[in-house]
Amino acid sequence: MQIYDEKSIEIMKISNKKAGIILAIIIVISLAISTIFMFSKQGYHEDELLTYNLANSSKQLNVDGGWNSPKDFNEYLSVSENQRFDYAQVYNNQIIDASHPPFYYALVHTVCSFFPTVFSKWLAYSINVIAMTGALILLYKIAKKISGNNLYALMGAGAYALSLACITTTIYLRMYSTLSFFVLAFMYMSIKLYEKKNTVNIKDCLLLSVITLFGTLTQYYFLMFGGLIGFVFLVFKIKEKCIKDLVKYAVFCFIGIALAMCIYPYILSNVLGGNRGLGSLDLSGIDAITIFTYVIYKLCTYIQVLSKDLFLNQIWLFVLCAFCAIGFGIYFRFIKKQKLNRKAMFAIVPSLVYFIAISMLSPFNSDRYVMASLPIITMLFVFAFIKIFSLIKKENLRLILPISIVLASAIGFATVKPYYTYGKTNLYEPKTDNCLFVGTAMLEWNKCIDKFMQYDSTMIVQNSEMSKTLIDDLDTLATDRGVITNGKIGELASAFMNNGSEKEMSNSMSAIKTDTKLQSLDEVTVYISRLTDEEGTIDYILENTSFENYELIQADYSFDDFYNWYDYFVETESYCNVYRFY
């Protein structure tokens, strides 16, 4: 089934030169919007701060009862003068972390090495800008391969470029813009190689190997997405009996993966035994009905994510558009007897299967895990409606679609706030000179490092006593959202909180009692983690220091504010209630 008819092509033709200019304008507008949100970004997701630490530093902070200075925190996040372009350190950090391959961190380290001792959100952002520019160009090229029409390709790429999905991916200081680039590059090369019937050349195959190599070394989800694209290539080449092409394709993909494993041999152990996915969790003792209903809840959560990123945060609008796309797809296939062209299947099958699989298997319900699929999903929705609008006989009415895309983008940016911008906190204006953080083995302090840099010194301690209300709060949240917990939400929460971890539970609360500096202070700002026993912590501080009073500076968010419990971690600035003791 073509997404256009021949008459439409003639009416809506646009030259390659004009298309290139328009695409450049779209990319500039998209990146300008992202940059505006970056200016307002105040606060970080904990993994964004880990980006800088894992890319730049071997610095260890005092997190078990010791004091840290702003210089300590800066050294934890930035490149020191004597560690510039030290890629061995980057490599070693990833071995220790055992979560991701090293290529993205090497990119961050390279940029930061030009600015030693500097911690700035703009350094990692610059990588995302370059990666997203390439991703949007590739999305346009893929759309043109599928549609054969410059204007339709611009609409497909433009809809994503001007969406919250694109902006969120660009401003999130992790590897997902880079992952999106390599996924789209692999898809584009696969379609290009598919078009060549037993005429695949070595140059293209080598490029495929390079893409596979760096995609694998960027994020392990590349292997899943790439595998799905490769499966489509396999099926069609077998049906067309182009076995030589298939063999070349498979061999050079394997070469790319093999080279990645030679460069970073920990890939296999990270993928099979790391801390990503439900398979890495210890779910023994949790009822099957709890797991099943939780997976359903996860799917609903990702529908919510898709609705926010692409459909103005309106689930009904997503459902309506999906219903129309599927309904008219059935109409065109079985009533009009029109088949999809095979190049479209390179986009449809991998993106949808990937999205659904990640929805069920991802360790947390986060938009970041499906970011790589959103460019293609956006394009597919646009193409579906281009096909639907082709039924309209009046050509002028077909302008409704591009106008709707622009209007929806404007409404979206005016009414829906992207993830990862934060900016609702007063914690960057310290009320005291010194700070005390009380958390757990979950290392919640990592979320707050940029805030700690505002104090003269910060003491970090661990409390082995968990929150007395956390499990009940999570149980209520889960039950209200359809999860049948059977009282086992504690085990499920524990499985996630200790996921793939080698964290050691310790208790350094006694340092509050014995530390002479803390005892000498007249006042101190105290961060108390959501995960720890808040009431017990407050009592301990009052009983073992000279402080007699306390007041709330900023309250933590409530779980009730979010449908997706992971949104709490995405939206909140600190995971803490913050007090002033005096």
Model-derived features with residue positions:
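Signature aromatic-anchored transmembrane alpha helix within multi-pass, membrane-resident enzymes
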Residues: A24-I27, V210, F254, F385-K417
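Hydrophobic/aromatic-rich transmembrane helices and adjacent perimembrane loops
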Residues: L179, M224, V319, N341, ...
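Transmembrane-helix signature of polytopic, membrane-embedded enzymes
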Residues: W122, L139-L162
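Transmembrane-lumen/periplasm boundary regions of multi-pass, lipid-linked membrane glycan transferases
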Residues: F73, F214-L217, M224-L234, I238-E240, ...
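Transmembrane signal-anchor helices characteristic of membrane glycosylation enzymes that use polyprenol
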Residues: A19-V79, I255-N270, I411
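Transmembrane alpha-helix segments characteristic
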Residues: L154-A157, L207, T212, V251-I257, ...
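Membrane-interface helix-loop-helix junctions at transmembrane boundaries of multi-pass membrane enzymes
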Residues: K17-K18, Y140, K144-S147, L151, ...
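Specific aromatic-rich, kink-prone transmembrane helix
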Residues: T110, L138-K141, G158-L162, C166, ...
